[in-house]
Swiss-Prot record:
It comes from Rhodococcus jostii (strain RHA1). It is found in: Cytoplasm. It catalyses: (R)-4'-phosphopantetheine + ATP + H(+) = 3'-dephospho-CoA + diphosphate. Its EC number is 2.7.7.3. ATP binds at residues 9-10, 17, 88-90, 98, 122-128. GO terms for cellular component: cytoplasm. Its cofactor is Mg(2+). Substrate binds at residues 9, 41, 73, 87. This is Phosphopantetheine adenylyltransferase. Belongs to the bacterial CoaD family. InterPro entries: Cyt_trans-like, PPAT, Rossmann-like_a/b/a_fold.
Amino acid sequence: MTGAVCPGSFDPVTNGHLDVIGRAAAQFDEVIVTVMVNKSKRGLFTVEERIEMLEDSTSELPNVRVSSWHGLLVDYAKQQGITAIVKGLRGANDFDYELQMAQMNQKLSGVDTLFIPTNPTYSYLSSSLVKEVATFGGDVSDMLPEKVHARLLARIAERAAESS
């Protein structure tokens, strides 16, 4: 059985993420979408909330499961018996950063990284940009799954109420 891990912060999951996950799922028997935990960053959503949103958003992909991990991604991949990491690339800046990570991961563990070019429809899309635009009232409804969009608007409203 071939498997891959598809890591990210997914804060929140976007349609761009889902495009890459779906395309990876078409290539591998199993894809583990892994929410990487960075304790130095305070996300808009908790890790548990991100997992819930990912599980809901990928429920129609039977060979996809969702998990989280704190530590080196290659350690997780080895623990799961996974030999490939899948990363989406939006452009040259992503490639420059991700290539160095891929080479380091390969050196540390022998785990290879496969790059999937992002669908041009989503090449501008990032979770950070979506959050920023939504915070200022911009319409991001076509950039996220419907339920994720609703949760994003609710969380932004909560944060606004807390700060006023």
